[in-house]
C-alpha cells in the first residue's frame, strides 16, 4: 500500500511512475485507490467523553535488561501473531465496520483480511499498530492498539451498555490469549499506554520509566492494582495478602486475581486521569504489597 498526498497534478505523475515501474518489473494487475477517511460522526460524538473500558496484555520478551522502546516490538513474532489473533477476534465480534489506522496516519475502511495484514506489518516494522471497529446500530466502538515495548490494549465504548457485559467480554478476550506468552494482563479505565506515558493522579506510587524499560520484569511487578488482572507466580511471591481477593488458577504459572466486588472498580465510568475510590485503591496497594514496582523498589533493584 502506498500513501500519496497532494494535488491531482502532483499525484497523477507519481501514480503513472509506479504503474510503469510495476510493468517494467513484470507485475500484472490493476492499481486501485481509496480516499483516507475518519471515524464516522456518530462515533466521534460517542467517544467525546473518553470513558473507555480497556484490557491490556503485557507479553514476555526475549530481550535483556534495559530495553529501549525506540528499538521496536520486544516480544518477537509469536507474540505479534497473538496480538493480531486476539485483536481481530475483538474487532470482529460484533461485526462492525473495520477501519485501519496505518503507520502513515491515514485511515481506511478495510475488510478483516486487510486489517489483519496491516496490523501484522505495523507491529513488525515499528511496534505501533491501531485498528478500530464501528457498529452504528449498536453504537459500539472497539479498538486494538499496541504500546511499546511489549503490550497490547483492547478498548470498548458502547452506548447504554451495562458495565458488567463489557467487563465480561474483556475478561474473555484476555483469557483467550496464549498464556505462555503473557507476563501481565489487567482490565481498567486506564490502559497500558496511559500507565507508561502519562503523569496521572497516583502515578507517583510507581516507577513507570523503570517499568517501560524493563519489560523482562513485567511477570514480576505491576504498576497499580486493578479490579481484574492475570498475574504469574512470580507476582504472587511478592504479594502481602490476597485473601480478600478471588483467585483462580489458570495454568501452571498464571492466576486470575479479581476483587470480590467489581462494582467499585468498574460501575462508574472514568476518564484515564481519574482514579477509583482512594480508600479502595489504598487497600488494594496494601494487599498487593511488593508486587507494585514503587520508585524505592526500582532503585533497590537498580532498574
Map each language-model feature to its residues.
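C-terminal interaction module
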Residues: 1-95, 190-303
